[in-house]
């Protein structure tokens, strides 16, 4: 007697259908405070952010509920900024991230330590979103202490490059303004 199952054709190996990632629209907290709308163009090159299939990154620094500085940069400009970063700084930042990076996403807790947004809400912190079109693909909160720790390890060459970027793209910001100081603030007389 033959096995009835052996006469059936084999089912092809088919992976179960993949669920589409849930679409997350860029939240209003990452819209431009100064323009009172979503970011439209790259802070560095001025091109339309929608023109970059690679996406873009929005960064906003806060002191309490006040926006201190904000930018949106296309990925090619982000890559160019990294190219302008000294090799010494790249190596130190890579080691820092290897040691401290946490597998968390969102704004509830720091991506580099266990500090929560509630704990830093009244101080300084950064919010970052990696976006494409109208969608936010990933996000992170970085507390002041972690930002300061990264600022302390960058080289003077990199610091000058980043200062030049700030001066060229944020002309209204005073030359001695440090949204996340990398050096002690000068004492007032």
Cite the ranges covered by each PLM segment.
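Short, intrinsically disordered terminal segments enriched in charged and Pro/Gly residues
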Residues: 2-34, 83, 87-104, 155-189
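Short, charged low-complexity linear segments at domain edges
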Residues: 9-25, 41-54, 77-94, 113-125
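Short recognition patches in nucleic-acid-associated and regulatory proteins
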Residues: 36-68, 105-136
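Short metal-binding segments enriched for Cys and/or His
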Residues: 67-92, 136-162
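Short, Lys/Arg-enriched charge-dense amphipathic segments
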Residues: 75-85, 111-118, 128, 144-153, ...
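Cys/His-clustered metal-coordination modules, chiefly Zn-binding fingers
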Residues: 99-103, 117-137, 142-145, 156-165
